Each structure stands twice: as structure tokens, then as C-alpha cells.
């Protein structure tokens, strides 16, 4: 038995200068797990609650001392003495103790930090790397794959202080044979994009996720700049590198008139018009994945978009599904989208996250493992991507150490598996729904 002997919570700082929750779980034998909860900027309305103090005299109300107190008191008292290797039981104890549908009593930030720290401690007690332990929890021990990165190299929307409406313009180095090669391609395109933007007299300041955040006349201009950068780097767009976008449509959807109002471009669209706007972009550029291409509540619009684009474009639900199996199940039954973005702080525990990934895969949906815009040096999502063989990861651009920490962990994992004589496959474009 890997007995829990101590649980510690503390307030630390994330990549945006805001507090977040970090937890330590200590086991008999001296094994320790340490994990921190991430935080989002553009959030779905049905996400599990991130508990903030609201005390304007500290961190502009964004302190997390209440959540930390829950870790140090109620949660610690409930799980000390339990077996850390019973992950589902540990998570369920915290969920039941919280007693709310959206974890608003303790906060998903408190529960998740402990959940992940517990998994890390349990993995250490079994002498396993975290990705291998996650594979065991997932019922797929020894089955790994390295994820195809979706690299956010131009930031807009809520992730940047510019006039670009679409939140993320991403590249996928699909021509790579290994994760390490994919990162090299991504870095070379990123540096060439800096040259392209400088030559146009544009800003090379970066947004929350490490991508550039220039003012551009249109979303098509962002794609044109990326195309130029890919070619300058010596690669072929559509062969070596494909494109992906996160529209974060809920951020520019006007619920009062039902219009998608892209203020940066000075254009407004109905739901169906916006789908056809995106369809035109996919005809001009090799865009193989679109995330949140409709407002989270516009299920009729999503159904139409899936009908129009779903046979050839990966349509990822982020705000749409919020890593929630109840919502995902309904979406699967109604034929909404064909992929889910996985953010474990949207649901608040490792066990529930694994359940969402399994449900998606069983239904033929892909699962894209994702960071949040507010991150720390915690690289757990790298292990999650490999341990569940998810196939794709979204963890930012080629700058900011909070993003690079995840890529570096993936490098370590890929190398470790190769050294062990059990290299993990890198799926490339085959990982993307509709592209196999």
C-alpha cells in the first residue's frame, strides 16, 4: 500500500502573474508528488469552477487562499491514510467531499492539483515514469504514442492585445518522423515568421501562449504570413506543415442578435455564414483542424458545420464539451463535431479526464491534449498525451518557458522510450481526424 501521510497546498504564481494552486502529496517511503493547476483566459461557461478569493486587496481579487485552505484542511484530512495507487477512489473522495456539480466548494484548481500530485506520488512509489503510470490507469499499459504538436505561432482573441479575432493560428509539422524533428520544424518556422513580420514592420511581441501577436488586417493575412514563413524555412505547406485554428467563437458571438461579430475585420456573420467563411479559408489553405468554430451554445450551428466540414476537417470541441463526459455524450449522440479538446482543469480530476478521453476514442472522436493560457512549469500534460496515446497536443509556440517545459518533457519521454528499445510511434497527419 502506498499510504498517503501528508498533503500540502500552497499559492504559487502562473505564467500571467496570477496565483494558482500547487499541491504536494507525500507517501510512506518518502515518495512525493508535486503538481500545479493551470488557468484559462477564454473559458467555457460549463467548466468546473476555478475558486478565486475575490479579495481585491490581494492580487486584484485573484488570490487562491481559499482553495489552498481546502487542500490543507478538508482534502488532507479526507485522504491521509488512503492508498495513493487507488486514483479513482482518491478523486471520488474529493469530488464527494466538495459536494457540488462544478466543484465550486473547494475549487477545481484545488482538487486537480491534489489529483495530479497524487498520481505523481503513486507513480514514484511504483518506480514508474508518470506516462507509464497514466497508461496503467487508462487500462492501456505499455501502449504509447508521441503526439503531433499543434503550435500556436500567431495569437489573437483573448490571448493577445491585438485586433485579430481568431484566437490561435497553429502549425502542425506533419512531415516529421519523430517528435524531436517536429519541434525542430516548428522552431524553424517560428523564427522565420519573426523575420516575415519584421520585414512587414509588424510587432514580434508574443501573447500568452508564446506566439506572435501582430495587428493584421484580416485572419487571412495571418495565414498568408504563416505560409510565407513555412516556405522561407524550406518546407512545403500542406505536405511538411499543415494548419489549424482555434476560433474561440464564443468570444465574438453576440448572443442578443445571434451574429458572429469579427470586429478586427469589421464583418458580421450568421451561424451558417461563419461556417462558409471558414470553409473558404480551408479551400485557400491546408487547414486540417478547426476548434470551437461556433459558439458553445450554438449546437444547431455546430451540427451544420459538422455536416459541411466534418468529413475532411477535424472539428474540435473545447468550450463546447469542456472535457465533460455528460456533455460529450450528448454531442456524440447528436453528431456534433468529431474531436474533443482535453483540458483537465475544465473537469477537475485525472480520473474524469481519462474517462473523457476514453469516451471520445470509443466514439471515433480524436482527443487533443491541451494546456491553458495561464500555465506553470508543470509538464503533466506531456505525460498525459503519451500515456493515453492521444496523438495530438496543443501546448503553445516555440517561446516562453511555461510552454517549452512541456515540449522538453516530450523530448525526454521520446528518448527514454528509444533507449528502452520500445520507441513510441509518431503518427503525424494520421493523428488528425479526417486525414488518415
From Swiss-Prot:
(2R)-2-phosphoglycerate binds at residues 167, 343, 372-373, 394. Pfam families: Enolase_C, Enolase_N. Its cofactor is Mg(2+). GO terms for molecular function: magnesium ion binding; phosphopyruvate hydratase activity. Keywords: Cytoplasm, Glycolysis, Lyase, Magnesium, Metal-binding, Secreted. Its main location: cytoplasm. Signal peptide: none annotated. The active site is at residues 209, 343. GO terms for cellular component: cell surface; extracellular region; phosphopyruvate hydratase complex. It is found in: Cytoplasm; Secreted; Cell surface. Binds a second Mg(2+) ion via substrate during catalysis. One of its GO terms (biological process) is glycolytic process. It comes from the Bacteria. It is an enzyme of class 4 (lyase). Mg(2+) binds at residues 246, 291, 318. It catalyses: (2R)-2-phosphoglycerate = phosphoenolpyruvate + H2O. PANTHER family: ENOLASE. Catalyzes the reversible conversion of 2-phosphoglycerate (2-PG) into phosphoenolpyruvate (PEP). It is essential for the degradation of carbohydrates via glycolysis. Component of the RNA degradosome, a multiprotein complex involved in RNA processing and mRNA degradation. Belongs to the enolase family. This is Enolase.
Amino acid at each position: 500500500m502506498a499510504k498517503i501521510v501528508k498533503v500540502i497546498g500552497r499559492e504559487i504564481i502562473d505564467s500571467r502573474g496570477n496565483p494558482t494552486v500547487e499541491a504536494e502529496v507525500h507517501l510512506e517511503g518518502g515518495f512525493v508528488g508535486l503538481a500545479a493547476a493551470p488557468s484559462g483566459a477564454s473559458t467555457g461557461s460549463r467548466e468546473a469552477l476555478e475558486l478565486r478569493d475575490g479579495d481585491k486587496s490581494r492580487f486584484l481579487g485573484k488570490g487562491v487562499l481559499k482553495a489552498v485552505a481546502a487542500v490543507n484542511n478538508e482534502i488532507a484530512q479526507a485522504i491521509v491514510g488512503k492508498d495513493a495507487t487507488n486514483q479513482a477512489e482518491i478523486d471520488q473522495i474529493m469530488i464527494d467531499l466538495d459536494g457540488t456539480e462544478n466543484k465550486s466548494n473547494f475549487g477545481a484548481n484545488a482538487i486537480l492539483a491534489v489529483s495530479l500530485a497524487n498520481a505523481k506520488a503513486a507513480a514514484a512509489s511504483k518506480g514508474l515514469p508518470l506516462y507509464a503510470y497514466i497508461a496503467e490507469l487508462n487500462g492501456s499499459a505499455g501502449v504509447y504514442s508521441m503526439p503531433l504538436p499543434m503550435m500556436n505561432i500567431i495569437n489573437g482573441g483573448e490571448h493577445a492585445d491585438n485586433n485579430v479575432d481568431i484566437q490561435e493560428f497553429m502549425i502542425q509539422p506533419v512531415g516529421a518522423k519523430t517528435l524531436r524533428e517536429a519541434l525542430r520544424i516548428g522552431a524553424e518556422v517560428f523564427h522565420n515568421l519573426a523575420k516575415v513580420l519584421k520585414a512587414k514592420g509588424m510587432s514580434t511581441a508574443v501573447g500568452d501562449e508564446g506566439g506572435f501577436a501582430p495587428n493584421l488586417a484580416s485572419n487571412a493575412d495571418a495565414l498568408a504570413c504563416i505560409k510565407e514563413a513555412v516556405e522561407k524555412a524550406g518546407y512545403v505547406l500542406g505536405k511538411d506543415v499543415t494548419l489549424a485554428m482555434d476560433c474561440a467563437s464564443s468570444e465574438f458571438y453576440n448572443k442578443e442578435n445571434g451574429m458572429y461579430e469579427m470586429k478586427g475585420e469589421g464583418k458580421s456573420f450568421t451561424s451558417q455564414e461563419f461556417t462558409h467563411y471558414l470553409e473558404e479559408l480551408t479551400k485557400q489553405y491546408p487547414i486540417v483542424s478547426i476548434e470551437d468554430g461556433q459558439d458553445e451554445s450554438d449546437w444547431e450551428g455546430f451540427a451544420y458545420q459538422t455536416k459541411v466540414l466534418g468529413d475532411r476537417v477535424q472539428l474540435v470541441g473545447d468550450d463546447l464539451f469542456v472535457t465533460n463526459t455528460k456533455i460529450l455524450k450528448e454531442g456524440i449522440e447528436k453528431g456534433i463535431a468529431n474531436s474533443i479538446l482535453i483540458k483537465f482543469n475544465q473537469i477537475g480530476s485525472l480520473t474524469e479526464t481519462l474517462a473523457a478521453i476514453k469516451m471520445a476514442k470509443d466514439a471515433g472522436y480524436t482527443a487533443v491534449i491541451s494546456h491553458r493560457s495561464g500555465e506553470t512549469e508543470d509538464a503533466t500534460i506531456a505525460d498525459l498525451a503519451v500515456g493515453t496515446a492521444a496523438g495530438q497536443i496543443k501546448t503553445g509556440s516555440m517561446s516562453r518557458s511555461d510552454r517549452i517545459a512541456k515540449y522538453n518533457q516530450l523530448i525526454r519521454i521520446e528518448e527514454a522510450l528509444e533507449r528502452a528499445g520500445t520507441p513510441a510511434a509518431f503518427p503525424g497527419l494520421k493523428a488528425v481526424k479526417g486525414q488518415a
